[in-house]
Amino acid sequence: DYFWKPTDPPYTVKRPIERRLELMEKELDREAVGTVLSGALDGWGDPLIPRFSLAVRLEVEQSVRLERLRARELAAFGERILPGGDMYENHREFMEWAARYDTAGPEQRSLARQKTWETGLPCPRLVLDGAAGLEENVARIREEWGKQK
C-alpha cells in the first residue's frame, strides 16, 4: 500500500505525498513489461501521469459497491469492524464516506472529482461496468490495450 502507512488499526495514517510517489516510482522503474496500478491518484498523483498508457475506471451501482466494500472489510478485519470492535468507528466512518462517493462534489474523492481529473489524462480512457463479468471486463481492457501497440 503506497497511500497508507502500515499501522494497527490500518488505514489511519497517510504517507506523505512525496513518499507515496517515491515508492511508486521505484516500483514502476523496476517493472520491465508494465504495471497495473489500482486506486485514485487525483489530487496527488499527477507526476505519474506521463507514465500512463491506459486509464480504466470501474463503475457499479452504489448499492452493489457498498455491499462489496462491506464484504471486503468483513473478510479482511472480521469482528474488529463490528459493534464493540476496535475498528468499528473507523469502519462506520469509512462506509459513510464511501456512500457519498457518487453524489459528493470535489471536496472529497468522488465520482465528479475523478471524472474531472480524467479529462486531463493524455492516454486513452476506458469505463467498465462493474456489474459485468470479470472475463468481459478483462477482454475489454485487452482490446483497448491492443490498440495502443
Regions found by a protein language model. Name each.
Residues 1-25:
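Conserved substrate/cofactor phosphate-moiety recognition/catalytic segment
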Residues 23-24, 44, 137:
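Short acidic active-site motifs
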Residues 28-30, 49-50:
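A short, aliphatic-rich alpha-helical micro-motif
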Residues 31-35:
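Loop/turn-to-beta-strand initiation segments
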Residues 40-47:
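Switch II of P-loop NTPase G domains
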Residues 51-52, 121:
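Short, structured coil segments at secondary-structure junctions
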Residues 54, 59-110:
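A glycine- and Lys/Arg-enriched "phosphate-lid" helix/loop adjacent to the NTP-binding pocket
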Residues 96-149:
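NTP-dependent small-molecule kinase module
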